[in-house]
Amino acid sequence: MTLLKRYHIYGERSSGTNFLDHSIKDNFDAINVFADDVKDVDDIIERCRKYGHKHWFGDDLDLSDTDDILFLCIVRDPIDWLRSIYRTPRNLYEPMVESQERFLFGKYASTAVFYDEKVSFKLGGYEYCNNIFEVRHIKLEWICEKLPKLVKNYMLIRYEDLKNDFQGTMKKIKDMGLIKKNDISEDIVKMKKWMKRDDLDDPIATFDFAQKDPKVKLQPTYYRPNYKPFNFSIEDYPKEFLHYEKVLGYLR
């Protein structure tokens, strides 16, 4: 087995990419090839063109000469993911969350993180699809089918497994060749304590609180949560986009 000291992560927003990256940094002597030791803007642009951003990736990448890199992909239960995205719509156009119906079945549009002529619109953060199910389906297809054929070292992780079997997941990453530190953290509570992505332990970040305090009833943005209730189940999921949810074990 070849020992690896470099890695890259792919996954949608609110799928656990930060949690996974933080866990790797705590437990392995490895460098994130996209995010670590960035020199300047030109360096970021070149890395984006070569490897892709963790959230924006696809066929436009140049993944040649990457045999010394472990590519980790993380996915999350579709309903939990939709609820989290609806709650905190990072980099989505604000009209998308005017209502649950608009969010689920209206046109999907993602705002750009940056733009440069050397990088395609898609890799810079621009995304346009018929709906949010379609964009997830396209990304899952690339993660599950295309990426494994492009790189030597590939691993797919479910957010639920990272959360519920942290030790087991870290061991699987070690078995892929990433060089571990002396001890792997056993305290999952400590590992998740810093991550307030869903604000589940914050009493003011709840729908009930929003009803009590009209000052926080604002249109949700990147920084402001959406307090509207979200009622949607896998039974309502469009059938044409269920294939990869079944492959990933999310159809019960």
Provide a role label for each language-model segment.
Residues 79-80, 162, 196, 200:
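Surface-exposed, flexible loop/turn segments at secondary-structure boundaries
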Residues 150-176:
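Phosphate-binding beta-loop-alpha motif at adenosine-nucleotide cofactor sites
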Residues 106-124:
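A short, charged helix-loop
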